């Protein structure tokens, strides 16, 4: 059963910049709560960069108390080392909400684009424009935060339709 107000954390995984966006769903109304980026030092040791992402994302969850989380699935890069590092950042994006007992959903980039813009191959500018239309009070300054809000919007749209949500992978039981 969905809480009266469902607060959703969207995450755009990245090793240097992990975007996050929070929306609230009340009935059919979707409202902007907050957004931002958790940064890690691009020159630091990998373990410390991952720790920075973990601490930053945990702080977002503590501050905004979302009920559920959703993450953009990452694509495979041509550079195996970059792919591995991004995968480790993605692991942080998955485990931090799970440690807070949030259910975590994952969505492909094309599904996010299609849900937000109607076009699964939309450009970043089109996604940003639709996020601003759907969440007029949003002030996401970075592309990473905009992408995270698009993830949260996608989860909210699919959350309204439980049959569609069941066809997507939900990880964890949540609160």
Curated annotation (Swiss-Prot):
InterPro entries: RNaseH-like_sf (IPR012337), RNaseH_sf (IPR036397), X-over_junc_endoDNase_Mg_BS (IPR020563), X-over_junc_endoDNase_RuvC (IPR002176). GO terms for biological process: DNA recombination; DNA repair. Its EC number is 3.1.21.10. Gene3D superfamilies: Ribonuclease H-like superfamily/Ribonuclease H. The keyword DNA damage applies. Keywords: Cytoplasm, DNA damage, DNA recombination, DNA repair, DNA-binding, Endonuclease, Hydrolase, Magnesium, Metal-binding, Nuclease. Mg(2+) 1 binds at residues 12, 144. GO terms for molecular function: crossover junction DNA endonuclease activity; DNA binding; magnesium ion binding. Its cofactor is Mg(2+). Belongs to the RuvC family. Homodimer which binds Holliday junction (HJ) DNA. The HJ becomes 2-fold symmetrical on binding to RuvC with unstacked arms; it has a different conformation from HJ DNA in complex with RuvA. In the full resolvosome a probable DNA-RuvA(4)-RuvB(12)-RuvC(2) complex forms which resolves the HJ. This is Crossover junction endodeoxyribonuclease RuvC. The gene is ruvC.
